[in-house]
Amino acid sequence: SAALLGMEGKKVLVLEKHFKIGGYTHTFKRKGYEWDVGIHYIGGMHIKKSFSRKLFDKITENNLKWNKTDKIYDRIIFPDKSYDFIAPKGKFIEQIKSYFPEESLNIDNYIEIITSINSAMFKYFASKSLTGVKQFIFGRYLTKDFLKFSDRTTYEALSEITSNQKLIGVLTGQWGDYGLPPKESSFAMH
């Protein structure tokens, strides 16, 4: 936000509490290993016309070079088995279904809901840019779909899709990326 406002000629003051600037984007080293604080990977950067890609290109003045993630971009490890998350989306769906063939329809339902959340999220944030009469007229319409997801926990929502606790565990295995465990996190952040 600060970068975009600055590019528009606005005066901006950014206050950083941490000793190293960068917020969610900085790294640190411990015992010879380098760790990133928050951004591990960002999907969709290979699509140059995507909103996210255009936003990052604008903020960085096209100075970021994006690397494609490995085919296996994440691995969820349980004591008895590991589950790979594979790109692209179609391969991810195939892989999850291969682990849980009896859950095929529930997995399709999950993917459909996640896709809906993504669409609803853009409408929700667009509504925040409206003011006055426009906010009054369009605000409720633009936010209603998002709020039906955001006001429930990830665990509650997934439990309505499936009763398979292992599948829920795998699908929520990345909960550290959004900071709260599934029984506390908003499903909209999942």
Where are these regions (language model features)?
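N-terminal glycine-rich phosphate/pyrophosphate-binding loop and immediately adjacent elements
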Residues: S1-S119
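Rossmann-like flavin
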Residues: P79-S186
